[in-house]
Amino acid sequence: MSANDTFLAVFLGSKTSTKMAAWNALPEAERRAREQRGIAAWKAWVEKHQAAIAAMGGPLGKTKKVDSNGIADIANEMGAFAVVRASSHEAAAKLFENHPHFAIFPGERVEIMPVLPIPGGLEPSGTARVVNLGERELTA
């Protein structure tokens, strides 16, 4: 793999989407059955792509925005994240084709982007950038 083989995957979905409205309209028993099917499918996805998953990431909570006006609560579409390693951007994206996030659950999409080197020499030369993501440390 190249030096630029690390990718951030962001799982997105809107609480006001038609998919979420349809999900919320399901009878409780059907929704629970789909949740169980979705959890099983997600576990199978993790097992299938275990070698490519650098960090499982996880669900994301409520968002705070910080800008020149201060701190404020905001809503966004981000629901979870993961970090994967792949030989190319295209290969990283292919890992998420038909992912349960949108194939079973009411998520809308997964966006995948390369994790780039920090520009302008902000990292001390000769050191690796280490990101602690829960159980694993990812060295880029």
Per-range role (PLM):
Residues M1-A140:
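Conserved, structured core segments of small domains
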